[in-house]
């Protein structure tokens, strides 16, 4: 069960309620309430627990409103059924006399056609009899039912408007803002939907403080993405925002994590693009996808296009192994990036589109693309201070024994990448559990209590994990990255 599932179910419940499908809405509301109840058992933070309890109460109020609407509609159905039964029981003899109704003001009908007939020109004989009362018009059951239906619809509209107001009052943990829709005229609908799926509308929930070290990279990304929206009058002319940033470094150093932090912190539309997004088996569609991607980014600006492993899309041109279709895609990507819409083409820097790229093979990237990615920064292996900070971030949810010395562990991790350090922490956190279940049967393992499983991690566990987990980056690779960044870097 995830928070994303709760959010989607709340959205579906409200949509069904607004559309009048109250049975389906109640199913989703009940499911959301059950999901939140289960989630509350896993929340240990008191403040967060109170917030989610408040969310549960507000959603429960919505569900009660929907139940009241369903009861009201059910009562209307019963009334209409009894009215039809009474209509069938009315006598149909011509001899009975109806009482005169209350006069009702009626609007004149536009241009009624008169029937010319000699049969009904003479009045009926019984209308001239003394004491006889002419049968008056009696409102039919059908008209009463239509009036009642209008009342039901007006009440439903009031409930819908009330539901919208309550939706606006709910916390941001559940509600989502509605965005403008991109006009897909001239493009294949499937292509537009494929790119819209790559827009990260949900929060990746990675903050700047979740990333250890990499201070210079954080400052550069904030300068390239955040500051132009805060100070648009400053970032004009030669100070226009950077159109492209390339992150270069060994695997596991935090390049993709920095991109997630940009999507979380910078409040821009974030496109997560890979090689599968921009390739198609049909001739010419890959180039259309590239152009459509940038047009959508300009529409949803300010926007950030993150291309992970960009060397797989835009490798060096002119090689013997290059295919014609691949060359056309690279050409379209280069053309679109040169007109991405910085201050040189758009007077408002807050409507910028920035390309953020990451690669482990910078030497394979095309020279023209390297020129368009104006900032080329090196994401190195973490320093001793960064390794210790990363250990604290990875172990903040674990209970550590008193003998654990993080500084000593960080010193023993020289040459480890961020991903390697995370693997060491994960392996060390499982050591106590492995010792506890050693020699037990599956039935005995299932009967273990929670306290027995959650034992503190000791220094010995980290020493054993370091022996099992080796570093994944060689010294020769580091030397090659440093040589490239000295020659082509732009920090």
Curated annotation (Swiss-Prot):
Give the top-level enzyme category: isomerase
Positions of modified residues (Phosphoserine):
42
Q: How is it modified after translation?
A: Phosphorylation by DYRK2 triggers ubiquitination and subsequent degradation. Ubiquitinated by the BCR(KLHL42) E3 ubiquitin ligase complex, leading to its proteasomal degradation. Ubiquitinated by the EDVP E3 ligase complex and subsequently targeted for proteasomal degradation.
Question: Which amino acid positions bind ATP, per UniProt?
Answer: 249-256
Q: Where would you find this protein in the cell?
A: Cytoplasm; Midbody; Cytoplasm, Cytoskeleton, Microtubule organizing center, Centrosome; Cytoplasm, Cytoskeleton, Spindle pole
Reaction catalysed by this enzyme? n ATP + n H2O + a microtubule = n ADP + n phosphate + (n+1) alpha/beta tubulin heterodimers
Q: Show the segment(s) annotated as Disordered.
A: 87-183
GO cellular component, alphabetical, reads: axon; centrosome; Cul3-RING ubiquitin ligase complex; cytoplasm; growth cone; katanin complex; lipid droplet; microtubule
A GO biological-process term: neuron migration
Per its UniProt record, what Pfam families does this chain match?
Answer: AAA, AAA_lid_3, KATNA1_MIT, Vps4_C
Instruction: Write out the biased-composition intervals (Basic and acidic residues).
Output: 145-169
As for what it does, the entry says: Catalytic subunit of a complex which severs microtubules in an ATP-dependent manner. Microtubule severing may promote rapid reorganization of cellular microtubule arrays and the release of microtubules from the centrosome following nucleation. Microtubule release from the mitotic spindle poles may allow depolymerization of the microtubule end proximal to the spindle pole, leading to poleward microtubule flux and poleward motion of chromosome. Microtubule release within the cell body of neurons may be required for their transport into neuronal processes by microtubule-dependent motor proteins.
The entry's family comment says: Belongs to the AAA ATPase family. Katanin p60 subunit A1 subfamily.
Q: How does it assemble?
A: Can homooligomerize into hexameric rings, which may be promoted by interaction with microtubules. Interacts with KATNB1, which may serve as a targeting subunit. Interacts with ASPM; the katanin complex formation KATNA1:KATNB1 is required for the association of ASPM. Interacts with dynein and NDEL1. Associates with the E3 ligase complex containing DYRK2, EDD/UBR5, DDB1 and DCAF1 proteins (EDVP complex). Interacts with KLHL42 (via the kelch domains). Interacts with CUL3; the interaction is enhanced by KLHL42. Interacts with KATNB1 and KATNBL1.
Please give the name of this protein: Katanin p60 ATPase-containing subunit A1
């Amino acid at each position: 069960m995830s928070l994303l599932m709760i959010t989607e179910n709340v959205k579906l419940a409200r949509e069904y309620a607004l559309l009048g499908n109250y049975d389906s809405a109640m199913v989703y509301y009940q499911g959301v309430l059950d999901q939140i109840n289960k989630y509350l058992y896993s929340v240990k933070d008191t403040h967060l627990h109170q917030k989610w309890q408040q969310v549960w109460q507000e959603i429960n109020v919505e569900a009660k409103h929907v139940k009241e609407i369903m009861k009201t509609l059910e009562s209307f159905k019963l009334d209409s059924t009894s009215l039809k039964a009474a209509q069938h029981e009315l006598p149909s003899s011509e001899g009975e006399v109806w009482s005169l109704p209350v006069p009702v003001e009626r609007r004149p009908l536009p241009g009624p056609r008169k029937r010319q007939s000699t049969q009904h020109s003479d009045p009926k004989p019984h209308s001239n009899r003394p004491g006889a009362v002419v049968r008056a018009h009696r409102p039919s059951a059908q008209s009463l039912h239509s009036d009642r239906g209008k009342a039901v619809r007006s009440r439903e509209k009031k409930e819908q408007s009330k539901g919208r107001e309550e939706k606006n009052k709910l916390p941001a943990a559940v509600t989502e803002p509605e965005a403008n829709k991109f006009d897909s005229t001239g493009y294949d609908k499937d292509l537009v939907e494929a790119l819209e799926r790559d827009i990260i509308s949900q929060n990746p929930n990675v903050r700047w403080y979740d990333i250890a070290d990499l201070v210079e990279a954080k400052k550069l990304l904030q300068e390239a993405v955040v500051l132009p929206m805060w100070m648009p009058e400053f970032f004009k002319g030669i100070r226009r925002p950077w159109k492209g940033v390339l992150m270069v470094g060994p695997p596991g150093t935090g390049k993709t994590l920095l991109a997630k932090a940009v999507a979380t912190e910078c409040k821009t539309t974030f496109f997560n693009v890979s090689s599968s997004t921009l390739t198609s088996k049909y001739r010419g569609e890959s180039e259309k996808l590239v152009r459509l991607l940038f047009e959508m980014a300009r529409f949803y600006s300010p926007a950030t296009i993150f291309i992970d492993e960009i060397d797989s899309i835009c490798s060096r041109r002119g090689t013997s192994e290059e295919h014609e279709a691949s060359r056309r895609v690279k050409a379209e990507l280069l053309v679109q990036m040169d007109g991405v819409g910085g201050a040189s083409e758009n007077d408002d820097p807050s409507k910028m589109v920035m390309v953020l790229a990451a690669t482990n093979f910078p030497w394979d990237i095309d020279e023209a693309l390297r020129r368009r990615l104006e900032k080329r920064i090196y994401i190195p292996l973490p320093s001793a201070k960064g390794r210790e900070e990363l250990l604290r971030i990875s172990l903040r949810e674990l209970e550590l024994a008193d003998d654990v010395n993080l500084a000593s562990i960080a010193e023993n991790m020289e040459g480890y990448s961020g991903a390697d350090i995370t693997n060491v922490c994960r392996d060390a956190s499982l050591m106590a559990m492995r010792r506890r279940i050693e020699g037990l049967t599956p039935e005995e393992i299932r009967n273990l209590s929670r306290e027995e499983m959650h034992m503190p991690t000791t220094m010995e566990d980290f020493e054993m994990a370091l022996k099992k987990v080796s570093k994944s980056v060689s010294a020769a690779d580091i030397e090659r990255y440093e040589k490239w960044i000295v020659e082509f870097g732009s920090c």
